[in-house]
Amino acid sequence: MLCAIYKSKKKLGSYLYVANREDFSSVPSVLLEHFGKPELVMMFNLLGRKALHNVDCNEVLETIKRQGFYLQIAKQDDGLFNSLSEIK
């Protein structure tokens, strides 16, 4: 499965993974406001041989299937995205 990976210009080290390029319909609007305008980094095959940095491909794949997106945040986060369940 190919996915599109976007980085945040507002939040260093934060990445948003979606199933289809430019399709943010599953991403809550509040999250997108905090994330800022997503900047495409690459298209990535989650079922391929290459690994992702700091995140498990299977976890990303299952989360995208379940909720339509995956949010990767920096290890040193200030808590902005920690309440993702409240944003939904």
From Swiss-Prot:
SUPFAM superfamilies: YcgL-like
Matches recorded under Gene3D superfamilies: YcgL domain
Residues covered by the YcgL domain: 1-85
InterPro entries given in the database record: YcgL-like_sf, YcgL_dom
Name of a matching Pfam family: YcgL
Stored HAMAP family: UPF0745
Annotated PANTHER family: PROTEIN YCGL
Official protein name in the record: YcgL domain-containing protein HI_1446
Protein's organism: Haemophilus influenzae (strain ATCC 51907 / DSM 11121 / KW20 / Rd)
